[in-house]
UniProtKB/Swiss-Prot annotation:
Domain of life assignment: Eukaryota
WD repeats: from-to residues: 26-65, 71-110, 113-152, 164-203, 206-245, 248-287, 290-329, 349-388
Assembly, per entry: Catalytic component of the Usp12-46 deubiquitylase complex consisting of Usp12-46, Wdr20 and Uaf1; regulatory subunit that, together wtih Wdr20, stabilizes Usp12-46. The Usp12-46 deubiquitylase complex associates with arr/arrow; the interaction leads to deubiquitination and stabilization of arr/arrow.
Homology family: Belongs to the WD repeat WDR48 family.
Biological function: Regulatory component of the Usp12-46 deubiquitylase complex. activates deubiquitination by increasing the catalytic turnover without increasing the affinity of deubiquitinating enzymes for the substrate. The complex deubiquitylates the wg/wingless-signaling receptor arr/arrow, which stabilizes the receptor and increases its concentration at the cell surface; this enhances the sensitivity of cells to wg/wingless-signal stimulation.
SUPFAM superfamilies in the record: WD40 repeat-like
Keyword vocabulary terms for this entry: Repeat, Ubl conjugation pathway, WD repeat
Protein name: WD repeat-containing protein 48 homolog
Molecular functions (GO terms): ubiquitin binding
Any one biological process term the GO annotation gives: double-strand break repair via homologous recombination
Amino acid sequence: MLTHKTCQARKKMQVSFVIRDAEEKQHRNGVNALQLDSNNGKLYSAGRDAIIRVWNTRTESNDKYIQSMEHHNDWVNDIVLCCNGRNLISASCDTTVKVWNAHKGFCMSTLRTHRDYVQALAYAKDREQVASAGLDKAIFLWDVNTLTALTASNNTVTTSSLTGSKDSIYSLAMNPSGTVIVSGSTENILRIWDPRTCMRSMKLRGHTENVRCLVVSPDGNQVVSGSSDGTIKVWNLGQQRCIQTIHVHKEGVWSLLMSENFQYIISGSRDRNIIVTEMRNPSNKMLVCEEKAPVLSLGYNIDKTGVWATTWNSDIRCWKLPMYDRCTLSSGGMDAQWTMGGTELACIKGGAAIKECTVLNDKRYIITKDSQDQVVVYDVLRVIKKEELGPVDYEEEVKKRNKQVYIPNWFTVDLKTGMPTIVLGQEEVDCFAAWVSIEAGLPECDDPTTEIKINYGKLLLEALLEYWTPPHSMPPNEMEPDVRGNGYFQVPKHTPVIFSEVGGRTVCRLLVRDAAGDSESTLLHETAPQWVTDVVIERNIPKFLKIPFFLQPHPQMTKPERTKKDRLVANEFIQCRKVCEHVLEKVLNAETTPSGGNANNSLQNSQSDANSEGSQLPAEERIELWCNDVIVDPNMDLRTVRHFIWKQSTDLTFQYKTKQNFNFDGK
């Protein structure tokens, strides 16, 4: 027996968020599973966009959307309705199993017992028992009545574990009375347990590839399995053997649905076909329809005259089923049969999934292309969609919008759900690496002569957690106003923010606006990593990244006798005009004035006298910088020069020379 608790050991963490609309009424990716509540006609769909949606199948309207159920942050792989439709259980690639109030659509509790993707669920209606299984090879049994009674204070639940699986589990099934549980895995075998004793009773061999779907007969005597090997097999558990192998698909069988009398099989395949087959006479089969993409899930409509089908695409379609007594082959044989198509009874349209993404050189904007060839520009810093460009040439737009500027990577983009998920961390990519000038499109400061540098990662974290007030924090001093956010902008309040282990499990998920809640604030206090609290709560400034470089006279200098090569260190975002100012003020004056400054000083404190009395032109119009035989634009910063012009692993080297009509006396 295992005990589940919500506490977590502190590990390396990352923060992610999704750029999306406040309400996403359409699935934005494939749909993995369906459940129909026959009492009210509500259809529940589990999306690869991490959202469970609820649809009204009784309405003739095209808008069947009722509500979304959101708390997962990765593919929802399976769902089951239980307690006569009052509750729903979901399994996800975020490694959690969640318990929902199906009518109101909110998450009641989260189970974190699995250590990897949770792929499948099974439900015993008569016992109100649910089983979960996944890539961690584990199967857990849950008492539904116990799960629905969990609260914030009563958050410990005991579960039974079925052991013995040697490979990742992709399919799971139980009969209604809960006397048999069957699992299918990449072992290519079926394992059978008695869930009442948690003892394994047998294993069945016959498939040659992964077992993707399973159905157990109500009496627990038969099992029907579908496999990636393209076959459907019927097993007799009493005889412990396969009694029928059915070949009706050209590719893997991914979904199975049985008639009430357990005599007909409806199968969906990677070959996109949905086929009805008589189990006792497999030659008696009929093509229901050919979908537009591989079939992931099947479910009856409310009167069982049709079947709802989901695929890799985001649409959900209902197809009319042939009458079983007319399910016979035509005289033309198998080839003639395939010309018979099904009638589409209904369609719940899905949205487009983002398939391509490019981070522009400014490391603020990304350009995406979706499954409908629509190109969109997103502002990562402000967490918004900036511009819809339509079906334009994607590569040309990227080329047109990419500037010759180099800013370090400070985030990564994940497109797994079909929506842009931005990931911030401290591992391979440092979210505090991007220091930029105020010219980045943010409000100007009061003093335009002040050169303000901002850190993208710091600003974004401050905006995402603007409403978070840690518990037990000191009340603000009346003389010092309570500082919240970043002072420049706010992000959409509906934005989901996720704290998760690096390469691992989700620890906390909340919306930006909910961070002010007592429970959310406490959870953030317990889970937010130190590098987040340092900038959001402590208001510490991330360290500047510095670049060493050499500075030497150009061979064409009018005083070639000077050959000294100075080594300097400066912040990587310093613009080359500051190097020109340094040359003018410190280096050249050092030659003509005995009290001149030290050329080895850092540039950070160097102030230009180029516009002082007696000087008519700024330093960049009097000093010319060269790198790799290229004249450097004074607006470029050091890291951009190193990336685009220097292109070497050795220290950056500049050569300087005076422009025409300018001598060493600065006249």
